[in-house]
């Protein structure tokens, strides 16, 4: 379906973001991630220096978790959807909202409120393809 295709495209974009972020832990590729970090910390703080091993580990971990999120969305849209579109939508929706609430809340706590705003782009990207379909599916169930 068109909804599944949109979710698979979203999954690819999220995996690409995660791979870029993880690869940014390698010093020659940090500049690509620094652009995002500067936007996420704007206007309160400059982007942090990630020269230390702990910061680079956190980038690698964040990237890895983003890749896993993208793979989960792909699997839901591709495999789970065929068995139960409603279950796939719930899985994607609940995963997206749990990520958004935790990531955005603690981004604000960390002094990077713009990251919460940037997170809205990812949240919309994942949830908008399901608009309307969820209510129809639950009514039919």
Model regions: which residues?
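Membrane-helix boundary connector in multi-pass membrane proteins
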Residues: 101-118
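Alpha-helical transmembrane segments of helical membrane proteins, especially in multi-pass transport
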Residues: 58-74
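Short, charged juxtamembrane terminal tails flanking transmembrane helices
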Residues: 134-141
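Membrane-helix boundary elements
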Residues: 16-57
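Short juxtamembrane and helix-loop transition motifs at transmembrane-helix boundaries
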Residues: 50-55, 72-87
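Cytosolic juxtamembrane helix and N-cap/initiation of the first transmembrane helix
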Residues: 1-23
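Alpha-helical transmembrane segments and their membrane-interface exit regions
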Residues: 38-41, 120-133
